């Protein structure tokens, strides 16, 4: 693949943030008749899913206390479900099995799930919880359980394979992915602080916009961009 000299969008990071952005942006450009993924380049200093995206737990759930997070995760679950094969996603559901001290908080999570129409079941009481679990696991023996929140949707994904699947979807829309390419700095407009290019160890890519999806490496880019501490 020839090294690109100019594109509209440079995305830094080939993990879930960068590749998801590339895929959705390419799809949006195509839908609006403004081009396709050929306007987008993703660069990464290492390889696809080489960072946190490749080693996270892989759990897909909607079990969060913040209402805004719950609505966001409901949409995310829909994305996972949209192409389970390529995302290496297993829709086995998710369960929170809790002692009495957590029951009221879990009950609130359940109530908010119901408010947004998220498919889940909430079992309360020691005996009912035990019976519910034994219907699925005949050898269930855990003690001190007073509630079970069973999310019928959700599950888990095989991390690295899922990210490669995401890369395939982005590339299918024309996105170019350059791995083993390290960002060394940025170019700025002569009359403004706008970024006009991304400097790498393989050359400079002129661009209109830069999206940094580098996860825990964001600090180094923050410094390169001379943003306030």
Language-model-detected regions and their locations in the chain:
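Conserved Rossmann-like nucleotide-cofactor binding loop
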Residues: 17, 48, 217
């Amino acid at each position: 693949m020839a090294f690109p000299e100019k594109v509209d969008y440079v995305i830094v990071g080939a993990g879930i943030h960068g590749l998801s952005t590339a895929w959705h942006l390419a799809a949006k450009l195509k839908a609006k008749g403004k081009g396709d993924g050929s306007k987008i380049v993703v660069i990464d200093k290492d390889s696809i899913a080489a960072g946190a995206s490749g080693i996270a737990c892989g759990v897909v759930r909607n079990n969060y206390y913040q209402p805004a997070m719950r609505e966001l995760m409901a949409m995310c679950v829909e994305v996972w479900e949209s192409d389970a094969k390529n995302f290496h996603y297993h829709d086995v559901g998710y369960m929170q099995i809790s002692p009495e001290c957590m029951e009221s908080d879990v009950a609130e999570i359940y109530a908010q799930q119901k408010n947004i129409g998220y498919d889940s079941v909430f079992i309360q009481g020691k005996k009912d919880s035990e019976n519910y679990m034994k219907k699925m696991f005949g050898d269930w023996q855990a003690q001190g359980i007073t509630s079970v929140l069973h999310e019928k949707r959700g599950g888990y994904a095989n991390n690295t394979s899922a990210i490669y699947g995401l890369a395939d979807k982005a590339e299918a829309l024309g996105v170019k992915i350059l791995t083993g390419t390290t960002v060394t700095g940025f170019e700025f407009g002569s009359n403004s602080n706008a970024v006009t290019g991304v400097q790498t160890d393989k050359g400079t890519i002129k661009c209109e916009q830069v999206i940094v999806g580098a996860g825990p490496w964001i600090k180094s880019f923050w410094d390169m961009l001379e943003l306030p501490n």
